[in-house]
Amino acid sequence: MNNLKLDIVEQDDKAIVRVQGDIDAYNSSELKEQLRNFISTTSKKKIVLDLSSVSYMDSAGLGTLVVILKDAKINGKEFILSSLKESISRILKLTHLDKIFKITDTVEEA
């Protein structure tokens, strides 16, 4: 992935996916593929996407999040966005996507 890194930690009933780097048209399809594969194979019921290290996301990134949310629901899992920077939070609010995602301030709250 172009300057995008994923670290996955499974704890208790959830899997925490820490994303580092920007989510944009250059890397969103690879991010989508990796998350879809993970969601379909993990036994954890909660998937928490820790976005604390993501400062930029474009429309391709938003589309990827929507696809992952749908995949999670199909697989009987809860998909949670966590630790959003103000710039990402603002984009989600402007597009009204904050209404369809569960969003927490911290990973621990998820």
UniProtKB/Swiss-Prot annotation:
Phosphorylated on a serine residue. Residues 4-110 form the STAS domain. SUPFAM superfamilies: SpoIIaa-like. The modification Phosphoserine is found at residue 59. Gene3D superfamilies: STAS domain. Keywords: Phosphoprotein. One of its GO terms (molecular function) is anti-sigma factor antagonist activity. In the phosphorylated form it could act as an anti-anti-sigma factor that counteracts an anti-sigma factor and thus releases a sigma factor from inhibition. Belongs to the anti-sigma-factor antagonist family. This is Putative anti-sigma factor antagonist TM_1442. It comes from Thermotoga maritima (strain ATCC 43589 / DSM 3109 / JCM 10099 / NBRC 100826 / MSB8).
